[in-house]
């Protein structure tokens, strides 16, 4: 897509979105959220996105379900506002650990998330290193995963730490 670049943010982490926008030298997109008394939400895109290359940033921090619904409704609003291409930027992929059926009668929620995000209007998903590479195969749209390892290694090398050990679950 050759459309103008626009970045919008969900309410889960506005500071992250502002930092990203500042680093690439653009203003965040204008978006309005209304929460009704019954806890339903409305998302309004407050500028023209027709034909634009849109990135929507939303983290899956608590409240995961609320942030997920906000993401889906925002993607749908962008789709119906005729955005040229929509990339869902998800620093932490929702339900990433639910990537297999390890007991009977349970959902593979990670696959469901891929379906919902694509159906809502995303053309691509951009996320950080996934728990399991099979998650990329769940999606019918492209999934790009970025790694933080080079940045972390460079940071500790700059500090002069020679034999650091990193442990993670």
What is the meaning of each model-derived region?
Residues 1-169:
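PRPP-associated nucleotide enzymes
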């Amino acid at each position: 897509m050759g459309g103008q670049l626009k970045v919008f943010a969900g309410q889960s982490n506005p500071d992250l979105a502002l930092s990203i926008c500042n680093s690439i030298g653009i203003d965040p997109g204008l978006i309005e959220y209304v929460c009704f008394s019954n806890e339903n939400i409305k998302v309004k895109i407050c500028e023209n996105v027709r034909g634009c290359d849109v990135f929507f940033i939303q983290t899956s921090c608590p409240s995961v379900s609320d942030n997920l619904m906000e993401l889906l409704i925002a993607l749908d609003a962008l789709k119906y506002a005729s955005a040229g291409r929509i990339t869902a930027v998800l620093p932490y992929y929702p339900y990433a650990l639910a990537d297999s059926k390890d007991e009977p009668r349970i959902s593979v929620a990670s696959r469901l998330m891929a379906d919902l995000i694509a159906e809502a209007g995303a053309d691509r998903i951009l996320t950080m290193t996934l728990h399991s590479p099979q998650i990329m195969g769940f999606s019918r749209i492209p999934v790009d995963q970025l790694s933080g390892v080079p940045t972390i290694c460079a940071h500790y090398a700059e500090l002069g730490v020679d034999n650091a050990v990193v442990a993670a679950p």
